[in-house]
Amino acid sequence: MAYFNQHQSMISKRYLTFFSKSKKKKPFSAGQLIGLILGPLLFLLTLLFFHPQDLPWEGVYVLAITLWIATWWITEAIPIAATSLLPIVLLPLGHILTPEQVSSEYGNDIIFLFLGGFILAIAMERWNLHTRVALTIINLIGASTSKILLGFMVATGFLSMFVSNTAAVMIMIPIGLAIIKEAHDLQEANTNQTSIQKFEKSLVLAIGYAGTIGGLGTLIGTPPLIILKGQYMQHFGHEISFAKWMIVGIPTVIVLLGITWLYLRYVAFRHDLKYLPGGQTLIKQKLDELGKMKYEEKVVQTIFVLASLLWITREFLLKKWEVTSSVADGTIAIFISILLFVIPAKNTEKHRRIIDWEVAKELPWGVLILFGGGLALAKGISESGLAKWLGEQLKSLNGVSPILIVIVITIFVLFLTEVTSNTATATMILPILATLSVAVGVHPLLLMAPAAMAANCAYMLPVGTPPNAIIFGSGKISIKQMASVGFWVNLISAIIIILVVYYVMPIVLGIDINQPLPLK
């Protein structure tokens, strides 16, 4: 266990170091300084010189705000969350929305859904339930190198549906490194060193990629999907339920995990090592060290199952009862969170209750503010007439094959998110796609869903996602190798996303992809 803890600490330090290298002591990097000046400059230039006859002044003003905010989001001139507070100042200043209207977007039901999801995830991490779940899955799948690789991917993918992708990978990487070290230490005379090295590279990448892929399974799995849910409701007044998205998302995750596993095992890192020395023994040892399931773990497990059942049954059961007919996914998330605050813990030396308010220090408030800022900006775009004007300009695309548009959007966003924040990318591009759907005469989810899913998928560069940074920080993989392997995983993801959105999603969600929805 000491080795496990030592490597978890080592990975954490490398992960933090990786993201702090460029900051040093300077207040702004060159790119940030350019963005800091360019954002307000674009705002002023738009107000002064951009005056189309068919766009009211309010629309010009919101376009100027959007350019400013988008520039600061892309360049991270100031923290992304701080940029997301600009609508609170700028929208009332231009008399687009009242302060009350803007502020209400930061308390949207979607934000509380994600807040509750975060609290549940932190409860799992606090009482170590996530580690037990991961080790149990790996132990059940098998002992061969192929099965160990698959086991790690399934465990990481499952965890990242409910805890952050970063947390899921941070849990699994030290376990993976411990298995690799054990294999090197117990290496037999007839074992090929090259095969072990190929296996360790495939295992490290498999954990990182599975952490990213798993986020597509549920609405709380990754920020772009929450943004999709919010923007879809904001622009069209329709809801994507937690349960229905799972029917779309989980098969997508299963297929993507399966194909990525086959690619890593039999194409990218093909080797002759059938069984890993000491692999299964180490997994069982880690499980034994956890001991019997503790009271607190059982409580969190029960609450987790309850939350899942409520989210899954809300659409076809809770909505039919008068008492619970107005319950939303966010309502369920907060109800579950309150239960965690109420139930006492037996291990009072550690914590008095399952969750206490110390959890506030661990919550990603910045992400929640970003969601609110995106929703506020989307409302401004709608109320100012900018959305309608953009739709008119995009009508020139009418007649272009919808599948071609989906392919272009998916590939564009997928490679864009390699160098930009996935949350910022989704927040910027989804309102544009909502308007584009009206212009080209297709259902908005045909364009918005692949963009949100693609925004989550970045496999080529360490800066693409936190999981990529973590696995790069392990020292087992080079940027060149990550880019080479990740490029093909990007293409695999693009193909699966396009097929799912075009052929599976319409059936599950009951939509006609050729039927546009009117903007609110």
Curated annotation (Swiss-Prot):
Positions of transmembrane segments: 30-50, 55-75, 77-97, 104-124, 160-180, 207-227, 242-262, 298-318, 323-343, 362-382, 399-419, 428-448, 452-472, 491-511
Topology term for the membrane: Multi-pass membrane protein
Protein location: Cell membrane
Positions of disulphide bridges: none
CC terms in the record's Gene Ontology section: plasma membrane
Molecular function terms from GO: organic anion transmembrane transporter activity; symporter activity
A Pfam short name: Na_sulph_symp
Record keywords: Cell membrane, Ion transport, Membrane, Sodium, Sodium transport, Symport, Transmembrane, Transmembrane helix, Transport
Statement: the UniProt record of this protein carries the keyword Lipoprotein: no
InterPro entries per UniProt: SLC13A/DASS
Domain of life: Bacteria
Keyword Cell membrane among record annotations: yes
GO biological process, one term: sodium ion transport
Reported function: Mediates the transport of the dicarboxylates fumarate, malate, and succinate across the cytoplasmic membrane via a Na(+)-electrochemical gradient.
Family: Belongs to the SLC13A/DASS transporter (TC 2.A.47) family. NADC subfamily.
Name used for this protein in its record: Sodium-dependent dicarboxylate transporter SdcS
Species per Swiss-Prot/TrEMBL record: Staphylococcus aureus (strain bovine RF122 / ET3-1)
Gene name tied to this protein: sdcS
